[in-house]
Each structure stands twice: as structure tokens, then as C-alpha cells.
């Protein structure tokens, strides 16, 4: 192969820190393989750890995501030291990777900008996330690399750059083979909606299902300087139209107005009945997982949910001390009061929320989101020297009227509990009850959101028991 034609496909992946609010990504590892476009064989590989300019960016959350610790990179080269090699590998070649258009390409451009150099430019791009979503569909469940690899029995994803790009190539080979066979055997198709738990099942679907042919001539679009913020180059119009028309998505600013989904488990008025809710001490960190589910049956739009085992992750937290109470001076865009308060977290609850945050953020990034992640646990700063989190009181809108969707009870010193009835959420009744220093028992739902480039988990109270 002529070394000057640069016809090889450059599969690449970067491992990065997981930034907190206001921080930037920092590359911790770069890995790439050059692949022959005619034989799909690996011709050359390169990988290296990268020392970030600021080692403090490597947080415990970052280590949980990719296993790269500060000690691993303290003697590694800076990005400036490997920039020539990275440029030579990438410039003028077709780039390939999983979610590279929204993530890896942006990180490469940022890294070159930080050292004052022009970034490499591709002559085309293959983003396997967009390509496989369109061509292969969600028959494996979600479109995470780890899920696709498990579907084909390729082992576990290590979240290390060179391993991931090699796995990416193998996944593409397997998917292409399946699509080729389907196009050749139109009467023997597999179900396109099989979940990871049932991928061993063999099902038949209507032979007239669309999307079973392989396009053998796909023009690879070049990427402009701002490509990281542009749509995927593949035809995702159906998904985009669905996003535009979907009425389930609500603004994070208007989170208090969201409707309670019928499937949500709500605690009964008997405070001894905690069915569906677990205390933090009763939960196992290894059983916490984040998964993608359709917004509604048949939808291509996916929403992220948190599970404990196979059940929705819902918490019962007793004796939470309120650090900052409800403050009526903060309003949402409709003029209604924002109903939330901040509580201190005990160590077990803190660990659970950190694990939820880590799992949800990783899935959010892996599924293609570029939104800024808002941690569920508020950072400790200034005089606030204890981990804390914000709890939201849900409201329901019925015409022009609003009412609390959160059940609110009050426990007297005698132990008797009564349900409180409020006229509407626009008055100041809660301000006198949920004050700084008071104590509540809370039944909490953890609800991930991703809207207007903001993503995170909000703690929504299904039921509150205020201690007198």
C-alpha cells in the first residue's frame, strides 16, 4: 500500500477525565489502529497514556470510568509531546470510532488548540454509533459498545483506548456480516428489539421489515472545524423529527411541572409501607445500573433510567437534615415558585448517589450526549463542608391549576402522622415547614434528564414526612 495515499482508515479512541461543572475534559490516553479499507486488517497500532497539565482533574469518578489513576500518568508524556504522532496518524485519513463525531473529535481539537496548533483534519468519517443505530438498529438493546460486544460474545469492554478501537472494528465486522446475511436471506431475520437480557432468544419477524439491505456505496462526508457540534452525517431524520415532536421532554428549569408517569411506584400513606423503596444501607453498589429505555413503545427516542437489580431505583431516606429550606423568591419561567430544598447526606446515601451519578453520566456520554453534566451531589465549598443534594417537590398541572404531586405528611412528637392538604403550590405554606435545621423522611425517585445541553439526575420526592 502506497504510504502517501493515506487510504487507511484510522480507528481511534481517547480516554478522558470526567469533568465536574466548570471543568474541561483532559485526555488521559490515546489509542489508534490503521486498517486496510479493502481487507479490514490491522496494519499499524499506536497507544500511549497522556499526562494532563493538571493532575487534579483525575477524580475518583474518572478512575471508576476507565481505571486510569494519577500514578499511571505522572510519568507519561504530555499531549504536546505526542501531538506530532497523533497528527501523522489522523491527518488526511478517514476517521472511525464509536461516537467520535460528538466526543473524540472534539477532544482532539481541544487538545491541539490548548497547545496552539492546528488540529488534524479527516477526509471522511465513520461514526459507528450513528451508522449502527440506523443500519443495525437496537436489536442488541442500547447502542453502547459494551452492549454490542456482549451481544456478539466479544467479551467485556475495558474502556482502554487500544482495546476499545479493536473491539469497535470487530463489532463493525459482525454487524456488517449480519446485515449482509439478512439481505441475502430476506425471510430469516432476527428481532430488532431484543434486549441484552434476551439476546440469546431467537425470534422471527415480518419479512417485510425495512432496513435490511446494506448500502455498498456510502459517501463519507468531511468534517469542518465545528463538526463536533453538527448532526451526525447519516440520515437520522426520523429520530430528529421524533425528538422535535416528543412531548415527554421537559426543561430542567420546569422540572417541578412534570407529570408523574403511571409506571412510577409511589409510597402509600402508611409510612411503614416502603414497598418499592430501599434504604441506602439495604442497597448494593454493584447492583446499581443505568439503562436506556424507549420513551414509549416503538419509539426510537431513548430515556435513561436507574435500576437496582431489575427494579427502578427508589430510595427511602430517614432523618434527613435540611441545610437550605424552600425559598419562594426563586421562580421558574412560568412565574411559579421553584419548590426544592437542600439536605445533608450521610455516608451511605452519599455513596449511593455517587454511584448512580457515575453510572448515569457514563451511559449518557456513551450514548452520544454532549450535554454538560450536573452532579447530583453538590460540591463542598465555602462554609458548606458537608456533602449535600437538592430534593425537588413535584407538582402536577391540570389546566390552569397546579397541585403538589408529592405527598406531604407531618409526624407529631407523639408519633402520630397526618397527611397535609395544601390549597396550591403558589403560596408560602411549605416555607414554614421545610426550614433550615428541620428533619424529614423522604421517599425519593431518581430521575435522569438531558435537556438544552444540561444533563444530570434530579431527586424527586414522592413522599415527605416532616418531623415536628
Curated annotation (Swiss-Prot):
Which cellular components does GO assign to this protein? cytoplasm; nucleus
Provide the alphabetized UniProt keywords: Cytoplasm, Exonuclease, Hydrolase, Magnesium, Metal-binding, Nuclease, Nucleus
Q: What is its main location?
A: cytoplasm
**In which compartments does the protein localize?**
Cytoplasm; Nucleus
Binding residues for Mg(2+) 1 = 13, 15, 164
Q: E.C. number, please?
A: 3.1.11.-
User: Which SUPFAM superfamilies does the record associate with it?
Assistant: Ribonuclease H-like
Q: Hey, what tissues is this thing expressed in?
A: Expressed in the sieve elements and phloem pole pericycle cells.
> What are the Exonuclease domain coordinates in residue numbering?
11-172
Q: Which cofactor does it need?
A: Mg(2+)
The annotated active site, in chain numbering, is 159
Q: Does the keyword Iron apply?
A: no
UniProt induction comment: Regulated by the transcription factors NAC045 and NAC086.
UniProt xrefs under SMART domains: EXOIII
**UniProt cross-references to CDD domains, sorted A to Z:** DEDDh
| Keyword Cytoplasm on entry | yes
Binding positions (Mg(2+) 2)? 13
Gene3D superfamilies noted in UniProt: Ribonuclease H-like superfamily/Ribonuclease H
Per its record, what are the GO molecular function terms? exonuclease activity; metal ion binding; nucleic acid binding
What is known about what this protein does? Probable exonuclease involved in enuclation of sieve elements.
What is the protein name given in its UniProt record?
Protein NEN1
Point out the gene that encodes the protein: NEN1
Amino acid at each position: 500500500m502506497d504510504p502517501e495515499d493515506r487510504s487507511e482508515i484510522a480507528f481511534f479512541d481517547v480516554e478522558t477525565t470526567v469533568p465536574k461543572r466548570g471543568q474541561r475534559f483532559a485526555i488521559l490516553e490515546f489509542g489508534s489502529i490503521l486498517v486496510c479499507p479493502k481487507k479490514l486488517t490491522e496494519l499499524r497500532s499506536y497507544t500511549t497514556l497522556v499526562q494532563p497539565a493538571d493532575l487534579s482533574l483525575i477524580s475518583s469518578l474518572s478512575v471508576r470510568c476507565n481505571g486510569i489513576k494519577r500514578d499511571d500518568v505522572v510519568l507519561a508524556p504530555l499531549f504536546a509531546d505526542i501531538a506530532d504522532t497523533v497528527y501523522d496518524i489522523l491527518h488526511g485519513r478517514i476517521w472511525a470510532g464509536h461516537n467520535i463525531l460528538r466526543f473524540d473529535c472534539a477532544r482532539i481539537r481541544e487538545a491541539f488548540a490548548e497547545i496552539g496548533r492546528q488540529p488534524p483534519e479527516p477526509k471522511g468519517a465513520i461514526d459507528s454509533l450513528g451508522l449502527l443505530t440506523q443500519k443495525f438498529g437496537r436489536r442488541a438493546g442500547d447502542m453502547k459498545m459494551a452492549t454490542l460486544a456482549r451481544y456478539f460474545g466479544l467479551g467485556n469492554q475495558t474502556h482502554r483506548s487500544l482495546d476499545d478501537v479493536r473491539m469497535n472494528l470487530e463489532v463493525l465486522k459482525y454487524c456488517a456480516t449480519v446485515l449482509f446475511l439478512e439481505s441475502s436471506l430476506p425471510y430469516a431475520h432476527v428481532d430488532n428489539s431484543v434486549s441484552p437480557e434476551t439476546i440469546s432468544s431467537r425470534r422471527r419477524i415480518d419479512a417485510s421489515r425495512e432496513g435490511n439491505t446494506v448500502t455498498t456505496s456510502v459517501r463519507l462526508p468531511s468534517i469542518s472545524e465545528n463538526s463536533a457540534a453538527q448532526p451526525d452525517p447519516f440520515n437520522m431524520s426520523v429520530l430528529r423529527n421524533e425528538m422535535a415532536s416528543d412531548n415527554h421532554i421537559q426543561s430542567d428549569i420546569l422540572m417541578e411541572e412534570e407529570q408523574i408517569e403511571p409506571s412510577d411506584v409511589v409510597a402509600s400513606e402508611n409510612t411503614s409501607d416502603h414497598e418499592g423503596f430501599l434504604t441506602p444501607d439495604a442497597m448494593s453498589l454493584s447492583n446499581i445500573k443505568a439503562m436506556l429505555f424507549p420513551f414509549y413503545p416503538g419509539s426510537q427516542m431513548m430515556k435513561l433510567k436507574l435500576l437496582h437489580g431489575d427494579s427502578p431505583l427508589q430510595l427511602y431516606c430517614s432523618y434527613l437534615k435540611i441545610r437550605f429550606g424552600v425559598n419562594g423568591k426563586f421562580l421558574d419561567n412560568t412565574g411559579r415558585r421553584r419548590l426544592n430544598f437542600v439536605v445533608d447526606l450521610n455516608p451511605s446515601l452519599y455513596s449511593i448517589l455517587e454511584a448512580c451519578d457515575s453510572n448515569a453520566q457514563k451511559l449518557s456520554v456513551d450514548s452520544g450526549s454532549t450535554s454538560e453534566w450536573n452532579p447530583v451531589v453538590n460540591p463542598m465549598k465555602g462554609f458548606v463542608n458537608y456533602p449535600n443534594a437538592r430534593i425537588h417537590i413535584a407538582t402536577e398541572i391540570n389546566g390552569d391549576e397546579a397541585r403538589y404531586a408529592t405527598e406531604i405528611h407531618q409526624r407529631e412528637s407523639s408519633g402520630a402522622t397526618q397527611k397535609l392538604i395544601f390549597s396550591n403550590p403558589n403560596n408560602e405554606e411549605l416555607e414554614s415547614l421545610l426550614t433550615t435545621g428541620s428533619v424529614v423522611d423522604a421517599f425519593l425517585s431518581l430521575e435522569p434528564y438531558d435537556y438544552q445541553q444540561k444533563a444530570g439526575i434530579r431527586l424527586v420526592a414522592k413522599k415527605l414526612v416532616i418531623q415536628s
